Regions:
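Acidic anion/phosphate-binding donor-loop and adjacent secondary structure
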Residues: 25-33, 169-175, 214-238
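A charged, aromatic-enriched C-terminal amphipathic alpha-helix characteristic of glycosyltransferases
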Residues: 362, 376-413
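Short hydrophobic beta-strand element within catalytic cores of glycosyltransferases
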Residues: 338-342
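Acidic donor-binding loop of glycosyltransferase active sites
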Residues: 130, 311-324
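Donor nucleotide-sugar binding/catalytic pocket of nucleotide-sugar-dependent glycosyltransferases
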Residues: 188-227
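Conserved catalytic-core segment of nucleotide-activated headgroup transferases in glycan assembly
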Residues: 59-62, 186, 205, 220-297, ...
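Membrane-proximal helix-turn-helix segments that form the acceptor-binding/catalytic region
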Residues: 126-128, 175-193
Length: 414
């Protein structure tokens, strides 16, 4: 037996004796102890993966912002955390909401609460008119189980609202999680809200059918908008700088493909040494390329620094291996950078504005060649303000009104 095989054998033995995997459960799927609440008031429950401040950005922040829009109705609101345990010291503040640590039945009369149901077999009080707003796929899977229990207790299963922000089976290899995530798109009586028309087009093309479906277009982050309105018309000199969205921990952002294409480009372009390359998104060690070029890591930037960096840079790269458009390419293009991204089945975001080039069937050579085209061209870099995107005009308020009407929520009296 070779040393390599001996090590493999030893590893299997250690795994078997000390790290035996539990094949009878998936940690995100919960079995809640549902208890009856006789409170007759309607309530909408946000099912979320975390409410710890360090986690509340991107998709979680979008979900919370969408949920609080329902304050306009005369209903109770409850945030149920199903993923990470709540850390009180870093709880994300939601105006008017109170965190209930121990959840006795008396607290089911509170109108706006946050509760921690991250632990399996947690108790959960359910009303006859409880509705659920699911976010990540396993919150929808858990909601389905709760709704089945609601039907047994009260004789009626309420519709479920499902905010879909990506095609989540794609987060996994073909596996149990893949199948379970995909199954949530077939649950009965769903009101589905997509966070872009590109994502909705993908679901439509693949034959998914829902009771009702809506989509809203992304809008520019308010803080970025403020910087753009202050500085977007000024004559800022742009540097020979390439900025890309670098998140190696998220396979769908294709970090390796970008790095390999940058190395290929550095050999194609005889003036590549005149360019600086930066990665933003995750804290990384610098990556050395050939021709003595280095990808310098900026990590997670403040909004102000990110905005300033975009206004001073010429080229952006942001890939997303999913039907979700992602926000960095839209932001970079709005701030006047020439942006390279990828198409994906029904997604082609080059229609957003003329600063974006969406590459079909992207590979290392194609990305390197498109980058070479940009670094050797005489180009005017112009801030392009898509009015609805920059001014925050979206369909969200109309969608919330339509959902409220369908669920027979009454508007609050002014």
């Amino acid at each position: 037996m070779t040393i390599k095989n001996e090590i493999k054998h030893l590893k299997r033995k250690i795994d078997k004796n000390f790290f035996q995997k539990d094949y009878t459960s998936i940690s995100d799927i919960k079995d809640y102890q549902v208890k009856i609440s006789k409170n007759p008031r309607p309530r909408l429950n946000l099912l979320i993966t975390s409410m710890n401040s360090q986690d509340v950005y991107a998709g979680i922040k979008s979900a919370v912002d969408f949920f609080v829009k329902f304050k306009k109705f005369d209903i109770d609101l409850r945030i149920i955390v199903m993923g990470k345990r709540i850390d009180e010291s870093s709880l994300y503040p939601v105006p008017d909401f109170t965190f209930i640590k121990d959840y006795p039945i008396e607290n089911d009369n509170d109108s706006k609460i946050i509760c921690d149901s991250s632990k399996n077999c947690s108790s959960l009080f359910i009303r006859e008119r409880d509705y659920f707003l699911s976010t990540m796929w396993f919150t929808a899977y858990n909601a389905d189980s709760i709704l089945n229990k609601q039907e047994k207790l009260f004789g009626k299963r309420m519709p479920m609202v499902y905010l879909i922000q990506d095609y989540e089976p794609g987060f996994y290899p073909w596996s149990s999680e893949y199948l379970l995530a995909e199954s949530t798109y077939h649950l009965e009586n769903q009101l589905v809200v997509f966070n872009s028309r590109y994502l909705k087009d993908y679901f439509d093309k693949n034959g998914y059918v829902f009771e009702k479906s809506f989509y809203f277009d992304p809008v520019l982050n308010e803080n970025l908008r403020n910087v753009l309105n202050l500085n977007g018309n000024s004559n800022i000199e742009r540097k020979n700088r390439i900025l890309f969205y670098g998140r190696p921990s998220k396979a769908r952002n294709a970090f390796q493909l970008i790095c390999m294409a940058l190395e290929k480009w550095s050999l194609l372009d005889e003036n590549s040494s005149q360019w600086e390359i930066y990665s933003a998104g995750e804290d990384l060690k610098d990556v050395k390329l050939k021709n003595n070029l280095v990808i310098k890591s900026l990590g997670k930037m403040s909004v102000e620094n990110y905005a300033k960096f975009m206004l001073e840079s010429k080229i952006g790269i942001s890939l997303m291996v999913s039907p979700h458009p992602s926000y960095p390419p839209l932001e970079m293009a709005t701030f006047g950078m020439k942006v390279l991204t990828n198409s994906f089945v029904t997604k082609d975001i080059s229609d957003f504005n003329e600063n974006i080039k969406s590459i079909e069937h992207i590979n290392i050579n194609r990305l390197a060649e498109e980058l070479h085209r940009l670094t050797t061209a005489q180009t005017d870099y112009k801030v392009l303000k898509n009015d609805n995107y920059v001014n925050g005009v979206s369909q969200i308020d109309t969608i919330v009104d339509n959902i409220g009407l369908y669920l027979k929520f009454q508007k609050c009296e002014v």
